[in-house]
From Swiss-Prot:
UniProt-listed GO biological process terms: symbiont-mediated suppression of host cytoplasmic pattern recognition receptor signaling pathway via inhibition of IKBKE activity; symbiont-mediated suppression of host cytoplasmic pattern recognition receptor signaling pathway via inhibition of IRF7 activity; symbiont-mediated suppression of host cytoplasmic pattern recognition receptor signaling pathway via inhibition of TBK1 activity; symbiont-mediated suppression of host toll-like receptor signaling pathway
Domain VP35 IID: 204-329
Annotated compartments: Virion; Host cytoplasm
Lineage: Viruses, Riboviria, Orthornavirae, Negarnaviricota, Haploviricotina
Keyword RNA-binding among UniProt keywords: yes
Gene3D superfamilies referenced in this protein's UniProt entry, alphabetically: Filoviridae VP35, C-terminal inhibitory domain, beta-sheet subdomain (2.10.10.70), Filoviridae VP35, C-terminal inhibitory domain, helical subdomain (1.10.8.950)
Protein name (database record): Polymerase cofactor VP35
Record carries keyword RNA-binding: yes
Residue stretches in coiled coil: 84-108
Annotated spans, Chaperones the nucleoprotein: 1-49
Organism of origin: Sudan ebolavirus (strain Human/Uganda/Gulu/2000)
GO molecular function, one term: RNA binding
């Protein structure tokens, strides 16, 4: 029976081998034929019958390992794809940030042009109003004021071409109840007068801020935290309070154009502009001398009875204990 199993499982080659081994005595009969009454040892059968099962399990394990390996490769490929996409997005974002920064830098001059455009706008409005009046009141010498007035009286309007007439004369005629001025001329004069008044009221104010003026002057000064830097802050503060920042700016630029140094230009501002004449320097409250910039330490002096800005006194440093030192240039 065992031989049949062996034959079934292993084929005729193995069966012939067993026969040869039995005939030569190399395999004892006691190991092959077992008494039916005695329970046969299942070891040979177990070994022979379980070998295919073990092979199947091994095959399944190999298949499982292959599937896991394939899944791992797919996961790795997916992760690499995601990493590549994230890198591309990061590069695109960095490129966009660079372009936005470049665009901001390019638009900065346009923003700075706003003040110039505003100034041109009001200048053009005033120029148009003056031109309307100019066409009606000035021109060829042959068209005298008397001829123009005669034309007014006859036709009730301004002559078609330019004519000579002074601005003050029109103003006097408008105030005169008996004066005859054409409606078109009157309207042109009113437009010019209202435009001039509007410019003086709305555009006569500083077109530069205290911060901008401070930065402009700082760019011309060497070092940092010097007595002249302190003077710039004082000048800008007083200029803002007195609404004269544009005058200070013009005076500073004029001094530089004349060849003066920035320090000399600042001193000239304190001496030429009335707001600084006989003006007392501001008081700066500090805790100790260490709060004063190092560049100003050598310019500290005892405070005189009546310090003035136009005499070189920039500010007064007031300590907590009541003592005071003046910054002198």
């Amino acid at each position: 029976m065992q031989q049949d199993r062996t034959y079934r499982h292993h084929g005729p080659e193995v069966s012939g081998w067993f026969s040869e081994q039995l005939m030569t005595g190399k395999i004892p009969l006691t190991e092959v034929f077992v008494d039916v009454e005695n329970k046969p040892s299942p070891a040979p059968i177990t070994i022979i019958s379980k070998n295919p099962k073990t092979t199947r399990k091994s095959d399944k394990q190999v298949q499982t390992d292959d599937a896991s390996s394939l899944l791992t490769e797919e996961v790795k490929a997916a992760i690499n794809s995601v990493i590549s996409a994230v890198r591309r997005q990061t590069n695109a974002i960095e490129s966009l940030e660079g372009r936005v920064t470049t665009l901001e830098a390019s638009l900065k001059p346009v923003q700075d042009m706003a003040k110039t455009i505003s100034s041109l706008n009001r200048s053009c409005a005033e120029m148009v109003a003056k031109y309307d009046l100019l066409v009606m009141t000035t021109g060829r010498a042959t068209a005298t004021a008397a001829a123009t007035e005669a034309y007014w009286n006859e036709h009730g309007q301004a002559p078609p071409g330019p004519s000579l007439y002074e601005d003050d004369a029109i103003k006097a005629k408008l105030k005169d109840p008996n004066g005859k001025v054409p409606e078109s001329v009157k309207q042109a004069y009113i437009n010019l007068d209202s435009t001039s008044a509007l410019n003086e009221e709305n555009f006569g104010r500083p077109y530069i801020s205290a911060k901008d003026l401070k930065e402009i002057i700082y760019d011309h000064l060497p070092g940092f935290g010097t007595a002249f830097h302190q003077l710039v802050q004082v000048i800008c503060k007083i200029g803002k309070d007195n609404n004269i920042l544009d005058i200070i700016h013009a005076e500073f630029q004029a001094s530089l154009a004349e060849g003066d140094s920035p320090q000399c230009a600042l001193i000239q501002i304190t001496k030429r502009i009335p707001a600084f004449q006989d003006a007392s320097p501001p008081i700066v409250h500090i805790k100790s001398r260490g709060d004063i910039p190092k560049a100003c330490q050598k310019s500290l002096r005892p405070v005189p009875p009546s310090p003035k800005i136009d005499r070189g006194w920039v500010c007064i440093f007031q300590f907590q204990d009541g003592k005071a030192l003046g910054l002198k240039i």
